[in-house]
Design a protein with these regions (language model features):
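N-terminal targeting/anchoring "stem" of glycan-biosynthesis enzymes
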Residues: 2-3, 26
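Extreme N-terminal starter segment of soluble prokaryotic enzymes
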Residues: 4-9
């Protein structure tokens, strides 16, 4: 995703999907509307930019993936999976993809839920539609830490090999003992309405952690981390770097 306002596409394939787009689009004036030619007239009067296409939607997917940060399809989940499958790269490159059913009852983040922001956008969209967000990402369902994007809204940068992020994320969602060490940065990093899970213990100094008691360490610091420490902890360490202007 870009650092600027996300580029959002609302995509309709069916008549009922187009009706849902026409209903929600005025409340999302920054979003662009993408519909088949035969539904373009129904979008007249919207404050949004409206683009229409002819032929099959599958021919438009590559451009959608290139031009937008969030793509919302108003169609069945299965149809979207088949449409986007040939274009998938990685969670670091793919846009967020969200599906809304034709009746606007359910909003489902399908792709790039965390890194691409699809989970958060699905919840926002569901609130506007009066729909149910269907989140399946383990850290969201379990109301625990999203290791790969923790502190992102505060400007924190993650420092760790990808294998560490994968391993530590698994330890967190599996409820294993986790040490969270915060030596720097803003303290309002826990944004859920629920309490911090009991398997996560907070420390103020790395030296206070008995490493043998924890499956992983999340360390918010400005200190240099010696290579020997990365090696000693193997795949158990993730470091977060807060901006210099934070405490």
């Amino acid at each position: 995703m870009t650092a600027e306002a996300p580029r959002i596409a609302l995509v309709a394939i069916t008549k009922h999907g187009a009706e849902q787009v026409a209903n929600i689009a005025p409340r999302l004036p920054q979003a662009e509307v993408i519909v088949a030619d035969k539904f373009a007239a129904a979008m007249a009067g919207l404050p949004n930019t409206v683009n229409s296409y002819s032929g099959a939607l599958r021919a438009q997917i590559a451009v959608l993936f290139s031009d937008y940060d969030q793509i919302v399809f108003f169609v069945s989940l299965g149809a979207v999976v088949r449409l986007i499958a040939p274009h998938l790269q990685s969670k670091d490159e793919d846009p967020g993809v969200v599906v809304v059913d034709d009746a606007a009852q359910f909003v489902i983040p399908v792709l790039s839920g965390h890194v691409g922001g699809a989970n958060a956008y699905a919840e926002q969209l569901a609130a506007l539609l009066g729909a149910t967000p269907v989140l399946t990402t383990a850290s969201d369902v379990g109301k625990t830490l999203p290791v790969d994007i923790l502190g992102r809204e505060l400007g924190w940068n993650v420092e760790a090999p990808k294998i560490n992020l994968t391993r530590v994320s698994a330890h967190v969602v599996n409820g294993e003992p986790i040490a969270f060490v915060q030596e720097a940065g803003a303290r309002n990093w826990w944004t859920r309405a629920t309490p911090l899970p009991g398997n996560i213990r907070v420390f103020e100094r790395f030296e206070d952690v008995e490493l043998d008691r924890y499956r992983a360490v999340l360390w918010v610091t400005r200190r240099e981390v010696p290579q020997a420490l990365w090696q000693a902890l193997e795949e158990r360490l993730v470091v977060y770097r807060p901006p210099e202007d934070q405490a």
